[in-house]
Amino acid sequence: MPHSTHKELLLGIMAGTAGISLLVLWYHKILKPRTTMIFPKFLSLGKKSDSLTLQDESYSEQGTSVVFQRGQLQILEKLNELLTNVEELKEEIKFLKETIPKLEECIQDELGVRVTVHQVSPQHRARKKKTTTTTVQRPATSNSSEEAESEGGYITANTDTEEQSFPVPKALNTHIEDLKLDVLLQKVDHLRLNEAHKMESFELLCDHKEKFSEEIEFLWRLVRAYGDMYDLSTNTQEKKHYANVGKTLGERAITRAPMNGHCHLWYALLCGYVSEFEGLQNKINCGHLFKKHLDIAIQLLPEEPVLYYLKGRYCYTVSKLSWIEKKMAATLFGEIPSSTVHEALHNFLKTEELQPGYSVSNYMYVAKCYVDLGESREAWKFCNLALLLPIVTKEDKDAHKEVKKIIGSLKR
């Protein structure tokens, strides 16, 4: 019985008890005196009538006394019963108060052990419907769950422990195909070209994680896949999980292969994803890491269009930073991050130069830059180019909506 229901019942009982007590008091103080005061009016009717009246009075008083005593006994019995019930309810409430916290602890402990209780995102539920056989659960590794300090200077849990917290259902079948590294990498890259197959690409990498976790070409692709899962997920806790695990794997990758541009690229991107869930200090910290490793990746992969797109986004964001955010960054790193809309535009146009029609989002940002610079004609041009591109990813869909908003503002 809920606590509020007990409380209402107790109040009702107390009100009822008070009502009965008032009834008894009313009888003693008002009703009984009135009965005795009526009798003297009949004394003036003569001796005979006086005698009869006195007899009637005596009989009436005795009868009333008996009835009243019986009524009192019944009331006392009811009161005693009510008081007993009140005491029982008090004991029950006390028991519930002591039990509920223990029950909550038990539930938390149970959830801590049975991680499969995790709520699956809509994408995962859709995939589950396609599965016709029982999901094969990968064996848990015996790695320690101790925490390690990340390159960014704050604490992140070890990767293996975190990865087990969010099991991913098989998209197609439960058979784990044992592939050679080169065949696996080709298949993963091919699957990832299609937005609908990115989850399968991620699963394939996870299935071979124990076998190829020391291979750098495998590792940076796994980091990239965690970034893909971040994009696919609609659940905030899942997105946070994929971002943190991917960032931790990315740190491992850049440590083992500091001259591999792809390691720096995808580590930088995961730092950006993690920053979405951080406070101002860690957000700025992640932004610093993002810029640092993006610049390294550009030096190592100067012809990779995605790098210039990401740098353009960084420059555009920094150009919009508030004074307090810049001051905080200066306090943390000794320098104020600075960039301009012109610098952002240069990087977005470089992306277009390396790969024309790179994405709806790239055109959208070019249009935004031109709007900020007061060049409406150029903004119109790139908005129209953006509308011509197909909508493939969620990012494309969001960018398409933003383009329509820009067009609306240009029409005013």
UniProtKB/Swiss-Prot annotation:
<dbReference type="GO" id="GO:0016020">
    <property type="term" value="C:membrane"/>
</dbReference>
<keyword id="KW-0206">Cytoskeleton</keyword>
<feature type="modified residue" description="Phosphothreonine">
    <location>
        <position position="141"/>
    </location>
</feature>
<dbReference type="GO" id="GO:0005876">
    <property type="term" value="C:spindle microtubule"/>
</dbReference>
<keyword id="KW-0597">Phosphoprotein</keyword>
<dbReference type="GO" id="GO:0097431">
    <property type="term" value="C:mitotic spindle pole"/>
</dbReference>
<keyword id="KW-1133">Transmembrane helix</keyword>
<feature type="transmembrane region" description="Helical">
    <location>
        <begin position="9"/>
        <end position="28"/>
    </location>
</feature>
<dbReference type="GO" id="GO:0005739">
    <property type="term" value="C:mitochondrion"/>
</dbReference>
<feature type="modified residue" description="Phosphoserine">
    <location>
        <position position="51"/>
    </location>
</feature>
<dbReference type="GO" id="GO:0005737">
    <property type="term" value="C:cytoplasm"/>
</dbReference>
<dbReference type="InterPro" id="IPR049039">
    <property type="entry name" value="RMD1-3_a_helical_rpt"/>
</dbReference>
<feature type="modified residue" description="Phosphotyrosine">
    <location>
        <position position="154"/>
    </location>
</feature>
<feature type="coiled-coil region">
    <location>
        <begin position="72"/>
        <end position="110"/>
    </location>
</feature>
<keyword id="KW-0963">Cytoplasm</keyword>
<feature type="modified residue" description="Phosphoserine">
    <location>
        <position position="121"/>
    </location>
</feature>
<dbReference type="GO" id="GO:0008017">
    <property type="term" value="F:microtubule binding"/>
</dbReference>
<comment type="subunit">
    <text>Interacts with microtubules.</text>
</comment>
<keyword id="KW-0812">Transmembrane</keyword>
<feature type="modified residue" description="Phosphothreonine">
    <location>
        <position position="159"/>
    </location>
</feature>
<feature type="region of interest" description="Disordered">
    <location>
        <begin position="122"/>
        <end position="153"/>
    </location>
</feature>
<feature type="modified residue" description="Phosphothreonine">
    <location>
        <position position="156"/>
    </location>
</feature>
<keyword id="KW-0472">Membrane</keyword>
<dbReference type="Pfam" id="PF21033">
    <property type="entry name" value="RMD1-3"/>
</dbReference>
<comment type="similarity">
    <text>Belongs to the RMDN family.</text>
</comment>
<keyword id="KW-0175">Coiled coil</keyword>
<keyword id="KW-0493">Microtubule</keyword>
<dbReference type="InterPro" id="IPR011990">
    <property type="entry name" value="TPR-like_helical_dom_sf"/>
</dbReference>
<protein>
    <recommendedName>
        <fullName>Regulator of microtubule dynamics protein 2</fullName>
    </recommendedName>
</protein>
